[in-house]
From Swiss-Prot:
Residues 344-442 form the SWIRM domain. The keyword Repressor does not apply. This is Histone H2A deubiquitinase MYSM1. Metalloprotease that specifically deubiquitinates monoubiquitinated histone H2A, a specific tag for epigenetic transcriptional repression, thereby acting as a coactivator. Preferentially deubiquitinates monoubiquitinated H2A in hyperacetylated nucleosomes. Deubiquitination of histone H2A leads to facilitate the phosphorylation and dissociation of histone H1 from the nucleosome. Acts as a coactivator by participating in the initiation and elongation steps of androgen receptor (AR)-induced gene activation. Keywords: Activator, Chromatin regulator, DNA-binding, Hydrolase, Metal-binding, Metalloprotease, Nucleus, Protease, Transcription, Transcription regulation, Ubl conjugation pathway, Zinc. Binds double-stranded DNA via the SANT domain. The SWIRM domain does not bind double-stranded DNA. A motif (LXXLL motif) lies at residues 745-749. It is an enzyme of class 3 (hydrolase).
Length: 818
């Protein structure tokens, strides 16, 4: 029933100046009208508020009635009839007595025992406000329970001390009825009884279900002590001459000062507080009686029997009204608290610390090293502190920052604890004394109830509080491989526990592998992507996937293009693939412009597109690419393998084949004048070290049939015009090798004759070669750098930039000399 009304806000307004006859006699409940004050909840016609709205269901009406009567019972402090509990559930009865967690109940007793209280006070004196350490010392209480108990401990301590102070001054006078202040302008000396009057702030009722995982002790030993001395129905007030007539106004507001609302079980004990201000009306729903000297603050008299873990600490220092000033009773008078310095006083002189001893102030300021932790010990604190002091002695009078001391404090803890020690030493004047960079900031606000411990203790407490409030970083750990990672990443992993022998063996293996890797790293420094990889041959175990045939026209253009440049040349292969016969025919070659960087040769995208269109116009498909190795073996480099593999995989998606051809015209290891040609594909097999895929070379067959002569002449003219003025152009009239009498042009003609030997008529072949030779001689005469001497082929010109002799020691594109 109570759960259905849990989220219902009930606003009941009444006139506190009028009262009606009680109608509690007609209700079937344990509450009787003679138990309570005259109710302000009834209207002039004597109707109860739950009877005003006919739309309220019977169950909700009963719930509202029960809640209001229970609240009236709380405020009146009258004994409850026994029969009232007969109609109630046991769970509801327990909710009145205590707040029980819906998840689980605490195994420890609800009320704090004397032993626990003594341990709490002992831990408070030893650790300060480190609730985790105090909870560990007590053992039977959680950190949350210790924190809640501490909140009420300090609050009740202030109340008790303030009450004892005022009790000696003001005697045992009783407060007159609050309602009488409306009719009587003066306060008389005669004692009158203060009947229970509902706090107007309670007119707005909100019932919530607490969800704290603990049982909370709602008995307060301080209140029990006060109840033995004075009647809870009365309160002591000082004798004064006159009190200004104050109109008591009631304003119903709902304010959420915490996630859990206060419930009151006794009459509020109004705390007397000396102040010079007057309560502000109509701003906060507080009923205030103001005199020139004394102010009654009902908000300070709320019951402390309910723990509120989510209430902000500022509620302990300020009244619930944001406009009321200094309404908390402090153990230090106002003048002292207002005269506090905004900053910690800079030290007057440099402090000398004994390197072999730890002061009590240090233990209080940096307690983490003195709590018995395995990672943080007093010896480690001494090491860090003394190292910082030594560094200060070395760099004095220059400012010693935190970063400069960290390199010498490896494996001494995280940077945050080192920074806290550095900050502490700086604040007490042990380091950075007299430096302008030293900052003495005001620490965070602290609980002023510790003021009586002495001014020095308070300063030490402030310092410790500031050090503990420094931002901490996320803790990082190393994974099993020694890499830094977040601690959460290692959650749920299983760790292998090894013996000492196994650890030693693995350590040796690790050292060996490390040495091996260092040795191989020096070898791999010369292992660049231009290293040549020999091609493997197909065998019976690994047969060729298809046959490769090359036309005469393709070989003629390929030789022409490769012979004219010392740099690598590049182009596309055109032809067709016959799947039924598993034959790839290379029928045409399209030279392309290259983008050479000196280390590699790449195909110009525009030229590549034009070459593809030219092949397509002749009815051929792109079935591969070619490039030259001018003066070294026609083996692919690692980069060539990677490029070929990418193209190969791309074309294979459509079922096409893609070959790679490498031609070497001036390889000095080749004893024959004919160019070396390699036609290859890349397999899926990896090398022993896994750095590349193994290339395989095909056996080339030459196709029968005459080439298109005019097309070959057109390609020749394009090649000569492009490369004759190039800085990498080959001087065609020079010997291509020291041990040969052949010039580069003669070598080219010999290669072309070899290609045409079995396919064309000898007369036609001779005519074709003669025209090619004449065209080369005529074209190169136009260039002053390439003058031809027909009579003396062995004579060399000193102004020639590139000759074939330079190939003996030069490897293009940065390739190693083989």
């Amino acid at each position: 029933m109570a759960e259905e009304a849990a989220d219902v806000d009930i606003d009941i307004e009444g006139d506190i100046n009028e009262s009606s006859k009680s109608i509690y006699d007609s209700l079937n409940t344990g509450f009787a009208p003679e138990h309570y004050i005259e109710s302000a909840w009834q209207n002039e016609e004597g109707l109860a508020p739950w009877a005003l709205d006919s739309s309220i269901s019977e169950e909700n009406r009963e719930a509202i009635k029960k809640m209001l009567l229970e609240e009236e019972y709380y405020l009146s402090n009258k004994p409850l009839a026994v029969k009232f509990w007969s109609d109630s559930q046991e769970g509801e009865k327990q909710c009145i007595k205590r707040v029980r967690s819906p998840a689980k109940a605490s195994s420890s007793p609800v009320k704090w025992t004397k032993e626990e209280k003594n341990l709490f006070e002992q831990g408070l004196a030893t650790f300060g406000r480190r609730w985790t350490s105090i909870a560990r010392l007590i053992g039977s209480r959680s950190v949350l329970q210790v924190k809640n108990y501490a909140r009420h401990y300090f609050k009740n301590k202030c109340k008790l001390e303030g009450f004892v102070k005022e009790e000696a001054k003001i005697g045992s006078l009783q407060i007159p009825n609050l309602q009488d202040y409306e009719n009587e302008p003066d306060i008389t000396d005669e004692p009158t009884t203060f009947r229970g009057r509902a706090d107007p702030n309670l007119n707005a009722i909100k019932i919530e279900k607490l969800s704290d995982d603990e049982e909370i002790d709602i008995t307060d030993e301080v209140d029990e002590l006060l109840s033995n001395k004075t009647n809870l129905d009365t309160i002591i007030i000082a004798k004064t001459d006159k009190v200004k007539e104050t109109k008591v106004e009631t304003e119903v507001q709902q304010k959420s000062h915490s996630t859990t609302e206060h419930s009151q079980t006794d009459i509020p004990k109004l705390v007397l507080q000396q102040t010079e201000t007057e309560c502000l009306d109509s701003v906060n729903p507080l009923t205030c009686i103001t005199s020139p000297k004394w102010t009654l603050s009902p908000q300070q008299c709320e019951e402390d029997d309910y723990d509120q873990p989510d209430v902000q600490d500022c509620l302990q220092e300020k009244c619930l009204s944001p406009h009321a000033e200094d309404l908390t009773v402090l153990c230090e008078n106002e003048n002292d608290s207002q005269d506090e310095d905004d900053e910690i006083k800079p030290p007057d002189q440099e402090l000398e610390i004994d390197r072999n001893f730890i002061l009590d102030e240090e233990k209080q300021a940096i307690p983490e090293f003195f709590e018995g932790r395995q990672a943080k010990t007093p010896d480690r604190y001494l090491r860090i502190r003394n190292y910082i002091l030594d560094q200060w002695e070395n760099c004095k009078p220059k400012y010693l920052n935190k970063t400069s001391v960290r390199p010498g404090l490896k494996n001494c803890g995280d940077v945050n604890c080192i920074g806290r020690i550095h900050t502490y030493l700086e604040l007490i004047g042990a380091i950075n004394f007299g430096c302008e960079q030293a900052i003495y900031n005001r620490p965070r606000p602290v609980d002023k109830t510790k003021c009586k411990e002495g001014k020095d203790t308070l300063e030490a407490y402030k310092l410790a509080h500031r050090l503990q409030s420094m931002r901490t970083r996320k803790r990082r750990v190393r994974d099993p491989w020694g890499n830094w990672c977040d601690a959460k990443d290692l959650e749920g992993q299983t760790y292998e526990h090894l013996s000492a022998e196994e650890l030693a063996r693995r350590h040796e293996d690790k050292i060996k592998s490390y040495k091996y890797s260092k040795g191989t790293r020096q070898v791999r420094s010369s292992f660049d992507p231009f290293q040549l990889i020999p091609c493997s041959a197909f065998s019976e175990e690994k047969k060729a996937p298809f046959q490769v045939k090359v036309s005469c026209e393709a070989m003629l253009v390929l030789d022409l293009h490769a012979h004219v440049s010392m740099a690598e040349v590049i182009g596309l292969l055109g032809g067709r693939y016959t799947e039924s016969e598993s034959v790839v025919e290379i029928c045409a070659v399209e030279p392309c412009n290259s983008l050479s960087t000196g280390l590699q040769c790449e195909m110009d995208p525009v030229s590549q597109t034009q070459a593809s269109e030219a092949l397509a116009s002749r009815g051929y498909s792109v079935i591969g690419w070619y490039h030259s190795h001018p003066a070294f073996d026609p083996n692919p480099s690692i980069r060539d393998i990677d490029t070929q593999a990418k193209y190969q995989n791309y074309f294979s998606r459509g079922g096409a084949k893609f070959l790679g051809m490498i031609i070497s015209p001036y390889n000095r290891r080749n004893p024959h004048p004919q160019s070396q040609v390699a036609c290859l594909i890349i397999s899926d097999e990896l090398s022993n070290d896994g750095s590349y895929r193994i290339p395989y070379k095909f056996e080339i067959e030459y196709m029968q049939g005459e080439p298109q002569w005019e097309l070959v002449f057109a390609k020749t003219r394009w090649i000569i015009e492009k490369y004759r003025s190039s800085h990498s152009s080959v001087s065609m009239d020079k010997r291509f090798r020291h041990d040969s009498e052949l010039t580069c042009l003669q070598k080219l003609l010999m290669c072309m004759k070899k290609t045409l030997g079995n396919t064309a008529c000898p007369l036609i072949t001779e005519e074709f070669l003669h025209r090619i030779e004449e065209y080369f001689r005529t074209s190169y005469k136009k260039e002053s750098n390439y003058q031809i001497e027909d009579n003396d082929p062995c004579k060399q010109h000193s102004d020639t930039t590139f000759t074939m002799d330079s190939f003996q020691d030069y490897e293009p594109n940065g390739r190693p000399s083989l």
